[in-house]
């Protein structure tokens, strides 16, 4: 089997998709809804604040379609940090009005497809390339209301496997 390319890993990512229990929300007393909103805003502010400390970032996005209402996205330096962020939301009053419909855990990375020189300690790497690569392994989340997300898996069934192709062929794709 062909070897996968060398990689450099960055932050771990949790894509936490949630639906809102709209019936429970409408039935809740106004003070309970206000408290839920207040706790939700405080939760997000405290998790967005880690961006200033170079410990990751978080954001909430609206989801179109019928699979979820919200995407809470966390990027952190470890899986433990992701677990903590997820559990803290579940403890909020707002979390009581939501249910996780799906979640994906991944890690940001760059590979030798980007540049062999980046992985060669003897090579001098262009500063622009280094900046580009650092942006890939520690990305900044957009200040947008919507994002496009699709789960990526380069393994396609039992017989067609991306990693069966030689490195140069994969790099050309």
Which residues fall in each region the model found?
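Hydrophobic, ordered structural segments
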Residues: 18-23, 60-142, 152
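Generic detector of short, locally flexible boundary/turn motifs and exposed helical patches
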Residues: 33-39, 65-70, 113-116, 162, ...
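Short coil/turn segments at secondary-structure boundaries
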Residues: 28-30, 86-87, 164
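Structural preference for beta-strand elements that scaffold enzyme active sites
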Residues: 13-15, 102, 147-149
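Short, surface-exposed beta-edge/turn micro-motifs
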Residues: 11-12, 68-70, 145-147
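Long compositionally biased, domain-poor regions of proteins
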Residues: 5, 39-55, 75, 79, ...
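An N-terminus-focused feature that recognizes amino-terminal "leader" regions
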Residues: 1-58
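Surface-exposed interaction/gating patches
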Residues: 127-173
């Amino acid at each position: 089997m062909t070897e996968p390319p060398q990689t450099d890993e960055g932050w771990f990512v949790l894509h936490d998709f949630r639906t809102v229990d709209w019936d429970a929300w409408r039935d809740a007393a106004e003070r309970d809804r206000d408290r839920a909103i207040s706790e939700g805003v405080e939760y997000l502010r405290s998790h967005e604040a880690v961006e200033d400390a170079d410990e990751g970032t978080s954001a909430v996005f609206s989801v179109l379609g019928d699979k979820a209402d919200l995407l809470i996205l966390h990027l952190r330096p470890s899986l433990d940090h992701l677990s903590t962020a997820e559990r803290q939301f579940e403890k909020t009053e707002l979390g009581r009005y939501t249910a996780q419909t799906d979640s994906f855990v991944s890690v940001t990375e760059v590979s030798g497809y980007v540049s062999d020189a980046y992985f060669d300690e003897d090579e001098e790497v262009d500063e622009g390339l280094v900046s580009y690569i650092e942006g890939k392994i520690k990305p900044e989340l957009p200040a947008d209301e919507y994002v496009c997300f699709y789960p990526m898996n380069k393994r396609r069934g039992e017989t067609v496997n991306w990693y069966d192709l030689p490195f140069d062929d994969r790099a050309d794709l």
